[in-house]
Amino acid sequence: MRINKEKRIGQVLFIVEGSSTEFNYLYKIFCGLLGYSYVAKKRNTPDYYVKDSDPYSRVAVVNTRESNIRDISENPKYLDEVFDVLRERYHFPVEQSAIYYLFDRDPESNTNIELIEKYIKILANPYDNEDGEQAGQLLLSYPSIESFIVSNFIDETINLYFGLGKEVKNYIGKINRFSLIKFLIKR
């Protein structure tokens, strides 16, 4: 994998379900490695974290109110309020941003198949969707951030098997997950 540190990305908004891992990895990649500007809002914390670096490449990371995919539509008021703050206080143009929903999918979480199918259909484009209401692309994996790390930065992954997302999370924790990001930054 080759990373182009000179590429400008404009504005990108990540909506995640987790409250720690996703924020840490996205920060390490977009701020530590690429030097982009960053705004983060975690649920259950009143403050926003901001790092201004590159005005042409800005990333915002927020999570849903609850750690479950159904919260995308069950609690839209929470995300609407967060989006309002991003627009007004941080001048982050939510409507002109690429929006990605990063959610896990394993046998013990996000098990409502009908709801997942609905989101896959309506959250299909990071900029605009058919319904004209809700932009964003759902990136559903097992678990999403950890799958990215394992598949890109660990050798011989074909020999690994994990039944649940928490198993892969524990595996990454044992091999010091941030050493993987430090390795990337040195490249």
For each predicted feature, which ranges?
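C-terminal accessory helical subdomains adjacent to catalytic cores in phosphodiester-
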Residues: M1-I9, N24-R187
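Short, hydrophobic/glycine-enriched beta-strand segments
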Residues: V12-E17
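Short acidic, Gly/Ser-rich segments with clustered Asp/Glu that frequently serve as metal-coordination loops
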Residues: G18-F23
